[in-house]
């Protein structure tokens, strides 16, 4: 098969969206109510990693970067994730805190996009979550200098065993280079796949203490 033939096959990959639509009359005034409903349905549907979200940032040159992380908490203040503070995404957020999040629930023919500003979590919030993690995950946080270049996986594995021995007694301390961010809720867009590619899109935008809701063309 030639490269052109393979490209033609990819171009014809498609499916119809048949899960149902999203109507304005069914929307709650608060987008978190709809988000919670959709997230609950994603969990009930046994989707793999229903809390997985794409976090998009930009560097100082305007170059976009994306990666998947797990949502760990959400409320009216924003959506929370944790990371190594020496990572590329953390440095980019420090330089430009404007980010977007995307929840891709393909099986349900849905996606949710959040736009807002990321702020560092307090040490108290980070410590509370850190010590709720499995012990090996706590140790793993100490091992990796995230986004740095390494010559072999064995370096990480050896470091993990070394630190597991070091921290075998008592509580694993919180690394100073490990923390989290809360992304404020400025805009939230809900997308539901529709028949004939007539998808339903609704954008919530915060205006003072209320939310403005607009339908967007697909």
UniProtKB/Swiss-Prot annotation:
InterPro entries: Pyridox_Oxase, Pyridox_Oxase_CS, Pyridox_Oxase_N, Pyridoxamine_oxidase_dimer_C, Split_barrel_FMN-bd
Cross-referenced SUPFAM superfamilies: FMN-binding split barrel (SSF50475)
Cofactor note: Binds 1 FMN per subunit.
Highest taxon, organism lineage: Bacteria
Catalytic activity annotation: pyridoxamine 5'-phosphate + O2 + H2O = pyridoxal 5'-phosphate + H2O2 + NH4(+); pyridoxine 5'-phosphate + O2 = pyridoxal 5'-phosphate + H2O2
UniProt entry tagged with the keyword Metal-binding: no
Gene Ontology annotations of biological process type: pyridoxine biosynthetic process
Residues the entry annotates as binding FMN: 67-72, 82-83, 88-89, 111, 146-147, 191, 201
Enzyme Commission number(s) from the entry: 1.4.3.5
Swiss-Prot/TrEMBL keywords: Flavoprotein, FMN, Oxidoreductase, Pyridoxine biosynthesis
Catalytic EC class: oxidoreductase
PROSITE patterns cross-referenced by the UniProt entry: PYRIDOX_OXIDASE
GO MF annotation, one: FMN binding
Residues binding substrate: 14-17, 72, 129, 133, 137, 197-199
Cofactor: FMN
Pathway assigned to this chain's UniProt record: Cofactor metabolism; pyridoxal 5'-phosphate salvage; pyridoxal 5'-phosphate from pyridoxamine 5'-phosphate: step 1/1; Cofactor metabolism; pyridoxal 5'-phosphate salvage; pyridoxal 5'-phosphate from pyridoxine 5'-phosphate: step 1/1
Described purpose of this protein according to its UniProt entry: Catalyzes the oxidation of either pyridoxine 5'-phosphate (PNP) or pyridoxamine 5'-phosphate (PMP) into pyridoxal 5'-phosphate (PLP).
Subunit structure of this chain's protein: Homodimer.
Family: Belongs to the pyridoxamine 5'-phosphate oxidase family.
PANTHER family: PYRIDOXINE-5'-PHOSPHATE OXIDASE, PYRIDOXINE-5-PHOSPHATE OXIDASE
Protein name per UniProt: Pyridoxine/pyridoxamine 5'-phosphate oxidase
Source organism of the structure: Escherichia coli (strain SMS-3-5 / SECEC)
Lineage: Bacteria, Pseudomonadati, Pseudomonadota, Gammaproteobacteria, Enterobacterales
